[in-house]
Regions:
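Walker A/P-loop NTP-binding motif of AAA+ ATPase domains
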Residues: 67-240
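AAA+ P-loop ATPase mechanoenzymes
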Residues: 1-87, 97-98, 103-108, 114, ...
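C-terminal alpha-helical "lid" subdomain
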Residues: 2-41, 205-206, 212-313
Length: 313
């Protein structure tokens, strides 16, 4: 059925009046307040009981991550800005306008905080970001989003992508990363503690993830900036001592150290020693390097009818 031009809504922002929704059989049903665009922000994807896509605001958790000129978040945001501006060149050569970044490293080094900070920058530029929890629900939501907003730049986030693949398999993700759904103007951001658990089809094929970036424990400049922000009024010499003692501690341990010493009154050196012993005892990704290939003997979860978990039938 061809859309009726008289039903189109001009302008932008909210429509404060109820409107008529056109049903497939030509019938009409009232619908509530509408918008021509999603507000700039981060969203998770879901489905209602009828399988219709929904977008729920997603809180961002980047408050503690310190940014400064030349930092990784600022470099990635610069790359993304250059990528958005290059759309015409992609089209002239005949490529989908897509880009992918995979962040990897041991747990606690700040991958999620880094991604959330990048997303904050994307949102500040007026764009939208979508977090993928269930690949099949996510794919349906992205296709629905493009029906409403066909040209808007978007960022898609896949945190702990290895866990997503283990639970749901990689078929839907590979379709998305390959652009099989022809959803254009996309930047994909993913993270993993265990890159070796991911099939080489994901990590070793260009155009799925074009940049693989290792995230290590924060360096001295980052630690100094973080401690200066958290420990207001601390003498420079004392902060330098903290910076020296915390060499090699991951981001999460650095936050715990501030709580342990500044909030709970524990001894600095004893707290550092305890946190370093805990970090040394944490599972390393190297322990899994000789394990079975991803999904071997570990089938993705499914509903009783065989459809993937999270897929509304």
């Amino acid at each position: 059925m061809e859309p009726d031009p008289s039903l189109s809504h001009s302008g932008s922002g909210n429509s404060h009046d109820f409107q008529w929704m056109v049903l497939p059989d030509g019938a009409f049903q009232s619908c509530g307040q509408t918008r021509t665009q999603l507000p700039a922000g981060a969203y998770s994807c879901a489905q209602d009981c009828y399988g219709r896509s929904q977008f729920h605001p997603q809180p961002l958790l980047a408050d503690d991550y310190i940014d400064f000129p030349g930092s990784l978040p600022s470099r990635v945001l610069r790359d993304i800005a250059l990528f958005w501006a290059a759309r015409g060149r992609f089209e002239r050569i005949g490529f989908l306008h897509r880009r992918g970044f995979l962040f990897y490293g041991k747990q606690g080094c700040g991958k999620s905080s880094l991604i959330h900070q990048i997303v904050q920058g994307v949102v500040a530029a007026g764009h939208v970001a979508f977090f993928c929890d269930h690949p099949y629900v996510f794919l349906a939501a992205m296709q629905e989003f493009r029906r409403v907003e066909p040209e808007r730049p978007l960022v898609c986030v896949f945190e702990d992508i290895d866990a997503t693949v283990k639970r749901f398999g990689d078929a839907a993700l590979l379709q998305w990363l390959d652009g099989n759904h022809q959803v254009d103007r996309v930047v994909n951001l993913a993270s993993t503690n265990y890159p070796e658990r991911l099939d080489r089809r994901i990590v070793s094929r260009p155009r799925r993830f074009d940049r693989l970036l290792r995230i290590d424990a924060p360096d001295a400049r980052f630690r100094d900036a973080y401690l200066a922000r958290k420990l207001h009024g601390q003498p420079a010499a004392e902060r330098a001592r903290w910076v020296e003692l915390t060499e090699g501690l991951p981001f999460a341990a650095l936050a715990e150290l501030v709580i342990s010493v500044a909030c709970l009154g524990n001894d600095l050196e004893e707290s550092v020693a305890l946190l370093k012993s805990l970090d040394a005892g944490a599972p390393s990704s190297l322990e899994f390097s000789d394990g079975p290939p991803p999904n071997q003997g570990d089938e993705p979860e499914a509903n009783c009818d065989g459809s993937p978990v999270g897929c509304c039938r």
